[in-house]
């Protein structure tokens, strides 16, 4: 993918001039843009650092080479920024959204999220996108003038990829698009699909590294087999790690190029000229009709052969029990919570407990579980 070193923003890209601003007004930064400020605040946040020790597919301590939420997030941000540049979109906004998209994830990945949602079913539920928003709006505790990071509207909007209708009704302008059917910015749409490209391909890589899936199994999936053959045609005799890496690299590049071409065509067909046109129209960032079923087949393969592999399911079952046990213990006796969460629990005990658990890393959650439940653990 060859693009210019710098591009002017397209007329339909979000710019500072059309931004809806921050909840708490601030003086403009002197040597950087407003969306750069958002990106920098996210990178320096506590929640961002914790992603290093949160699960992508494999529990953090299972292997040093497997991706964590942090390495996944960095890969998504890199891909998002490259795609944004190719399309003339706001790179800083797109990157900020990508960097923040998983800040609200629980320990133990989707298993932890599902377990915490089950615990919270009578208290408003738990949605990791909403928790990411809650993190940047309230939970980060760094600035004297406000809670959270005080990010621009467009960054916060992009973080909120999914939202149930009851929760959207509580979010005012930020939740309006889930009620009236309008679209987020192209930068937000782009970060969403860059996430999909990254995790689909990199889970292939990690799955092969782990030995839970094999090249022979993956050859049943057209999109993988096609790129593997192309790589081996170019480099006869290539095998092992280099074959896997080159095949995954080829798949990522092809999907990115497909996304760019289809999105450009969609923008042209829709006659989009402004950010308002983007919001009022159909979803524009998309794959081609030929790639969509092939990507679905790859995701289906990963679900059945990696995510549902018995060794992964054993980990996720243990994770659900840890989350459930912690939630139950803290609900029964909130005095077991750290002091700052005891204070919050006085006004909303379930949500304070959910905030505490969601902020844990995999290792911290396991350690906290041992402290509370393991015989002989007293500290």
Swiss-Prot record:
Which residues pair up as cystines?
none
Which PROSITE patterns does its entry note? HD
Residues annotated as transmembrane: none
Read off the SMART domains from this record.
HDc (SM00471)
What SUPFAM superfamilies does this protein's entry cite? HD-domain/PDEase-like (SSF109604)
A single GO molecular function term of this UniProt record: dGTPase activity
What name does UniProt use for this protein?
A: Deoxyguanosinetriphosphate triphosphohydrolase-like protein
Organism, by scientific name, is: Azoarcus sp. (strain BH72)
